[in-house]
Every structure is written in C-alpha cells, then in structure tokens.
Amino acid sequence: MRIIGLTGGIGSGKSFVAQVAEKYFSVLHISSDEIARRQMQKGGISYKRVVEEFSGMTDDLLCEDGEINRTALSKLVMNDPVLLKKLDAITHPAVIDEINTIIAIEDERKIFSAVMVETALLYEAGIDRMCDEVWYVYAPLATRSSRLIKMRGYSTEKTEMFLKNQQPEEEFLRRSDRTVPNGEDVTESDMIKIISAYLNC
C-alpha cells in the first residue's frame, strides 16, 4: 500500500487536495491535525500532560467545560520556540503512533491502494520517514493570505504572523517528490486530473 505524505504551508489547501483524493480515488485520508485535536480533548492521550505543562502559564488555557482552549494554547507557543518544542514533544509521538496503527490496520484490510497523510509538520514531526513519497501543495502567498482571511476569519495581523512562521517554500520544494498546484483558479476537475496523473506514475 502506497503511503503519501501531503504537506504545504497554511492556507495552501491541503485538505481540499486530500478530500478530492479520497472522494475520487482508492485513497484513505488521514489528517494529523484531526488526530492531534482529538487526542487533546478531555480523556485523550495528550490532554493531561498538556494541561499539566501549560496551565500555569496562562489563565485561559481551559474553557468552562474543561476542554483545552486551542486558541490560547496557540498564542502561548506561537512565538516561544521553547514552549512550542515542549508541546511538540508531547503531541507528536502520540500522533505518529496512531497514524502507524491506522496504516498497519489498513495494510491488512487491503481496501485502499494508498494512504494520504495530511500534515503541516511532515518533517518536523518525522512523519516523512513513514512515507513512500511526499506531495507539496503549492499556492501563491497572496492566495494563502486571502484564504485565511476569508475562509478562516483571521485578522490581517494573525494571518501575517502565521505566514511569517512557516517553513521556507524553497525547503518544501527541495524535499518533496511532487508539487500539487492549488491556486485560486484550480477547480475540482483540475485537481482530479493532477492527482490521477501522480497516482498513475
């Protein structure tokens, strides 16, 4: 079973590419963000350690229902490399373990011809080491900025902060096997053709 790592900068449209692949091809879509989010919910494998490590650093880490306030946590670690590294050390191993488990199960079931692991932190988390190939989703910076503002409701300041903290595009291109163009003018039909060509190589 082919394992594809799907990565790209914030706002590049990774989820769109993965959803098209899952809808029209024999591809299982795994989102590392969704796994990490679920694991940080109450009762999740990462919840207790995240609360223990970060609750004393901000008053609003927990929502009224006891769930982790992801916005507050993001603000806390965004501009502090030490805290970000601490958070990654908690969450990344658990996410990788679950991805490996899913892949092992699907390899036995033999339903899908490929697994597409969508993640923004492919190299940082070491997920690239489990992949047969890496696809980089590319969109112009202006397009990514527009998507974050229009689709996610980010302020201009927040958008600039996120884009500033991204890995350089040249690094993505250098380390990826294939580039998936996903600018504003790319339609679902266009994406089907792109994915089909890459899967049939």
Language model features: what each stretch is:
Residues 101-114, 128-137, 141-154, 164, ...:
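NTP-dependent small-molecule kinase module
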Residues 37-111:
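ATP-dependent small-molecule kinase phosphotransfer cores
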Residues 6:
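Hydrophobic anchor at the beta1->P-loop junction of P-loop NTPases
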Residues 12:
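ATP-binding Walker
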Residues 9:
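P-loop (Walker A) phosphate-binding loop of NTP-binding proteins
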